[in-house]
Amino acid sequence: VALVLDIHHHWVNSGEYISPTDDRFARIIDSWRGVRPVIHYSVSREDILIGHPTNVQPDMDILLAGEYKKAKLRAHSDYMWNNAVNDWALEFLQYADIMVESKAKNLASVALHKYYTENKNELSKQNVRQKASSEQPIFTPLW
């Protein structure tokens, strides 16, 4: 059985932005038995995190200390509005395809793809710095 990692729901449940080089994700990749895996990606609703900076990943501990509840944070946004979270999610493209879960469906996927293509050089530089010692295979996105 091939397992699918939902990175948003993992964050909601644990407060952790899991790394694509995490051993737990490696086990998920292995469950696909040579086929390129898929992950699910969504972001908390824009109308829940009103005023949150788009260049800062939401911090679960801070949100829970405020008026936010996990049940509300679980809900999918219309678009992938947080670029810091997008940058993190796009790190997974080296290892898996990304299935966008959002209210705006294909429009959100197209917008994320546009963000990726406009920023992939900078994202690649960040990934090289972060993973200089990694020996994980690098895949080409299928977009």
Question: What does each model-identified segment do?
Answer:
Residues N13, K69, L73-D87, A96, ...:
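Sequence termini and other peripheral, non-core segments
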Residues P20-G34, D47-Q94:
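A short, acidic, amphipathic alpha-helical segment used as a generic capping/interface helix at domain edges
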Residues V35-Y41, Y95-I98:
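Hydrophobic beta-strand segments of well-ordered beta-sheets in folded domains
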Residues V1-I39:
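Acidic/histidine-rich catalytic cores of soluble enzymes
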Residues H8-V12, I39-E46, E101-K105:
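Active-site beta-loop-alpha junctions enriched in small/polar residues
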Residues S44-G51, F139-W143:
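Noncatalytic linker/hinge segments flanking ATPase motor cores
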Residues Y17-S19, T54, H113-Y115:
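Short, glycine/charged-enriched secondary-structure capping and boundary segments
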Residues A2-L3, I7, L64-G66, E122-N127:
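Glycine-rich loops and low-complexity Gly/Arg-rich segments
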